[in-house]
């Protein structure tokens, strides 16, 4: 298996493209079109990390600020063929590090 990197994504259009690709591949978890579109739209303005293999996103996570001192994982997904490979843990670690950098209390 090729190396998978966790990267920060800043471009809102790229965030939308990545989240749409992955969420649409997960209909058992994100099968309601209106709700899925809301996740895609809202994550465009949030801190966003992607798991990338050979220039292709295979997972992502977005952080939502809930107060000046707290946040939560707003949405997170990993393509089914990459489940159970540790990508979710790595995305969680990136979100956690971002929360700490923003001064959120854990």
Name each model-derived stretch.
Residues 50, 56-64, 71-77:
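Conserved beta-strand in the GNAT
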Residues 34-38, 94:
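A generic local structural motif
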Residues 1-34, 52:
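Short amphipathic alpha-helix that is part of the acyltransferase structural core
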Residues 84-97:
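Conserved acetyl-CoA-binding loop-helix of GNAT-fold acetyltransferases
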Residues 79, 83:
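Residue-level recognition of the GNAT/N-acetyltransferase active site
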Residues 39-45:
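Short loop/turn motifs at secondary-structure junctions and domain boundaries
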Residues 99-106:
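Conserved GNAT acetyl-CoA-binding A-motif
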